UniProtKB/Swiss-Prot annotation:
Cofactor detail note: Binds 1 [4Fe-4S] cluster.
Residue ranges of domain 4Fe-4S ferredoxin-type in the record: 2-30, 31-60
Binding site for [3Fe-4S] cluster: 9, 17, 50
Annotated function: Ferredoxins are iron-sulfur proteins that transfer electrons in a wide variety of metabolic reactions.
Protein name per its UniProtKB record: Ferredoxin
PANTHER family referenced in this protein's UniProt entry, alphabetically: FERREDOXIN, OXIDOREDUCTASE
Residues that bind [4Fe-4S] cluster: 21, 40, 43, 46
Naturally occurring in which organism (per UniProt): Rickettsia typhi (strain ATCC VR-144 / Wilmington)
PROSITE patterns: 4FE4S_FER_1, 4FE4S_FER_2
Amino acid sequence: MTYIVTDECVKCKYTDCVEVCPVDCFYEGEFMLVINPDECIDCGVCVPDCPIDAIKPESPELIEWVERAKDFIENQGWKNITKKKCALPDADKFKDEQDKFNKYIIKNMH
């Protein structure tokens, strides 16, 4: 099992979670963070530190997020992040928007 960063993180990228992770398993892309499922120890320490509730426990309906995280780390070269940074400039504007992954990540991959 692992924890998963979901759609809520897209275009916000609050990084409060990375500082509390005991195994430094967060990776950073331009618009969001992901958790490396092979490094996560399923402790859940990061969950309460996410101000937008973007981190969820692995479940069958979220399995696509596990595959996306692996792809971003292994094939897209996302780098490990271990220190808190400022959120994206328009994070407050985007925090309640839905379907951000399809609107902003998928769109930029083509």
